[in-house]
Design a protein with these regions (language model features):
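Conserved flavin/dinucleotide-binding core of flavoenzymes
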Residues: 134-236
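Helical element adjacent to the flavin cofactor pocket in flavoenzyme catalytic cores
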Residues: 29-73
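Rossmann-like flavin
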Residues: 1-23
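Generic structural signal for well-ordered, non-membrane alpha-helical segments
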Residues: 2-5, 44-48, 52, 65, ...
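Mid-domain catalytic core of redox enzymes
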Residues: 64, 68-182
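Redox-cofactor-proximal catalytic regions of oxidoreductases
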Residues: 16-46, 182-185, 191
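Beta-strand segments within the central parallel beta-sheet cores of soluble alpha/beta enzyme folds
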Residues: 6-12, 68-72, 221-228
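Generic, well-ordered alpha-helical scaffold segments in large soluble proteins
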Residues: 8, 12, 54, 58-62, ...
Length: 236
């Protein structure tokens, strides 16, 4: 019933990439918050690549194989299989499967509306982020967006095809949980905001301004940054 609780719920619901008045956005927020209360949101020691390495190791233990640089343009490019799982968008799957998909599925894919994307920035910092809230200084994940109304307004704009002046920014501070992520006394940080589908606008300044708003002096700590647009993230 407090403003802080409403902002916490809104920030978690915003992970849905949907307007916060849509059905099930609150359910997603609760699904994220429950494990956070129990054990926190984990950070992989040594970098996120260690997650991929562990999964590949287990797959190979089970007799599986990983093939890289092997484009799949048709179903005929796949090895013999019982079930195929595609980590692509609907349009790519339709192009690969062609007439193998039922007509009703092809029609559904053709009419599918694309949702917002993400614009991400990674930073190397000369020290920890100087958040005005001491709890944020200790956290590994920080939702930056103001109160619940601010978060809801920003998310609604991205769905409507506009980039808000003050976006909701999801920030991760991995070096808080894993000291191997940065040299002693330094810090690593990444953050992203949602952008309309097809957006080509550079949101770096808007993201950094939002962090600066709640952590004055943040920009003075930036040693280097790597920027990834929605197109870059899709290519990755």
């Amino acid at each position: 019933s407090t403003e802080e609780a409403a902002a916490l719920l809104a920030g978690n619901a915003a992970h849905s990439f949907l307007p916060l008045n849509r059905p099930l956005t609150t359910a997603l927020a609760l699904a994220l918050m429950a494990p956070a209360h129990q054990s926190g949101w984990p950070i992989a020691e040594g970098g996120s690549a260690s997650i991929s390495a562990a999964l590949v190791s287990y797959l190979r233990h089970l007799g599986g194989e990983v093939r890289c640089n092997s484009p799949v343009r048709t179903l005929g490019d796949l090895p013999d299989h019982g079930v195929a799982v595609f980590d692509t968008d609907a349009a790519a799957l339709a192009a690969i499967a062609g007439g193998s998909l039922p007509r009703r599925v092809r029609r559904a894919f053709a009419g599918r509306r694309r949702g917002p994307g993400a614009f991400k920035v990674d930073w190397a910092l000369d020290g920890p982020v100087p958040w005005t809230n001491p709890d944020a200084r200790r956290a590994s994940t920080v939702h930056v967006g103001g109160n619940a109304a601010d978060v809801a307004a920003a998310e609604a704009m991205s769905v409507k095809g506009k980039n808000p002046e003050r976006p909701f920014v999801l920030v991760a501070q991995p070096s808080n949980a894993d000291p191997t992520r940065a040299p002693e006394g330094k810090a690593t940080l990444w953050g992203y905001c949602h952008v309309p589908y097809g957006s080509t606008e550079d949101r770096t300044d808007a993201i950094e301004a939002q962090i600066e708003r709640f952590a004055p002096g943040f920009r003075d700590l930036i040693l280097a940054r790597a920027v990834r647009s929605p197109h870059d993230l899709t290519a990755d």
